[in-house]
Amino acid sequence: MGAVNNAIRDSVLFTTADSVINWSRSSALWPETFGIACCAIEMISAGCARYDLDRFGVVFRPSPRQSDVMIIAGTVTRKFAPVVRRLYDQMPEPRWVIAMGTCAISGGVYNTYAVVQGSETFVPVDVHVPGCPPRPEALMHGFLLLQEKIKRSRALAGTPLDRVIAP
């Protein structure tokens, strides 16, 4: 009986559809190349050879229709917030948002009527990367946190396949 169990364990892969889908989603994140202020410089340097986000499966895309991650990197004004929301709405599902920098998280030092005090007021934010500006290593850590969040989520929730499989 031990030989049969060893043969099954060595040749059969047991997993769920959620874990396979989440693994593939977390291994290929495509953020939109969208920078607003000084945090965008650090975002650009994170994609260069020294830090190389490509090794984590992060490939910057030029269009919101090709990306699944939006990085809000910088100060968002009240006039610009609807534009950011429109870009978010153009992204395909599932989509995630990273708020990069103190200005994107809480408005930063700009406590005026023209600056939005936090990106969560107009888009749902999944990961916060604090700093002014945050280092590329902090953005890399933010991507790792996002990958872990994706792996823990239910990929088939709300789909017709979920209603068939769910007990």
From Swiss-Prot:
Residues reported in the UniProt entry to bind [4Fe-4S] cluster:
38-39, 103, 132
The UniProt entry's GO CC annotations, sorted and at most eight, read:
plasma membrane; respiratory chain complex I
In what way does this protein cross or attach to the membrane? Peripheral membrane protein
* Major subcellular site: membrane
Pfam family name, one: Oxidored_q6
State its location(s).
Answer: Cell inner membrane
Q: Report whether Disulfide bond shows up as a keyword of the record.
A: no
Q: Which reaction does it catalyse?
A: a quinone + NADH + 5 H(+)(in) = a quinol + NAD(+) + 4 H(+)(out)
Q: Which domain of life is it from?
A: Bacteria
Q: Name any cofactors this protein relies on.
A: [4Fe-4S] cluster
| EC number from the UniProt entry | 7.1.1.-
- Would you indicate the residue range of the signal peptide? none
Note describing how the cofactor binds: Binds 1 [4Fe-4S] cluster.
Q: Which UniProt keywords apply?
A: 4Fe-4S, Cell inner membrane, Cell membrane, Iron, Iron-sulfur, Membrane, Metal-binding, NAD, Quinone, Translocase, Transport, Ubiquinone
Q: Per its UniProt entry, what is the enzyme's top EC class, as one word?
A: translocase
Where are the bilayer-spanning segments?
A: none
Q: What does it do?
A: NDH-1 shuttles electrons from NADH, via FMN and iron-sulfur (Fe-S) centers, to quinones in the respiratory chain. The immediate electron acceptor for the enzyme in this species is believed to be ubiquinone. Couples the redox reaction to proton translocation (for every two electrons transferred, four hydrogen ions are translocated across the cytoplasmic membrane), and thus conserves the redox energy in a proton gradient.
- Quaternary form? NDH-1 is composed of 14 different subunits. Subunits NuoB, C, D, E, F, and G constitute the peripheral sector of the complex.
UniProt family annotation = Belongs to the complex I 20 kDa subunit family.
In its UniProt entry, what is this protein called?
NADH-quinone oxidoreductase subunit B 3
Taxonomic lineage is: Bacteria, Pseudomonadati, Pseudomonadota, Alphaproteobacteria, Hyphomicrobiales
GN (gene name) = nuoB3
